[in-house]
Amino acid sequence: MCEALQKYGVTPTRGSAFGATFSIALMVSCVPALAADQVNTGYFGGVAIMGYDPVAYFTEGRAMKGSEEFSYDWLGTPWHFASSKHRELFIAEPTKYAPQYGGYCTGEVAFNGATINIDPEAWAIIDGKLYLAYSKEFMAEFKARPSDLLAKAEANWPAVETQLEQDGFQ
């Protein structure tokens, strides 16, 4: 039984359609994701790049949490911004500000041709493009030799993106 079921003391029972449906739904949510959204929304956040403002990396030079008050849906996903000005900049040029590889970890795309979550504080802008990673330590390595890693990530991304589309995330 997965931790979420144990946490809530849920035990599947026979003969209960509601119990069976509830248990199945909860168990499915406990299975590690084999597929991921094309835009990284975190594990349960439902907001692009864990609610961080993609424009702030460029204009403020730092990671900033966005606000639901300043949100915009792009690629079927809500994006949060720290201000209405940042939201308007993003609306005008989303591909300029959106992170590469759907906001997933650049290293995971490069080394494993897969997606994992990120630490929004682990970031770099290289040649005018935003890259995110799972840790600040990895990002330090990435900044030391970006061309090697980007070549691998660029080679792997089309297959990763295709897999995401095949899994029904567009």
Residue positions per predicted region:
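Compositionally biased, disordered extreme N-termini, encompassing classical targeting presequences
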Residues: T11, A17, A33-A36
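N-terminal secretory signal peptides that target proteins for export/translocation
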Residues: M1-T13
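Short, solvent-exposed linear motifs at loop/edge-of-secondary-structure regions
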Residues: L5, F18, F22, S83-S84, ...
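Basic side chains
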Residues: R14-G15, R87
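Bacterial N-terminal signal peptides
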Residues: S16-C30
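Charged, low-complexity intrinsically disordered segments
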Residues: A33-Q170
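Extracytoplasmic entry segments of secretory-pathway proteins
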Residues: C2-L5, C30-A35
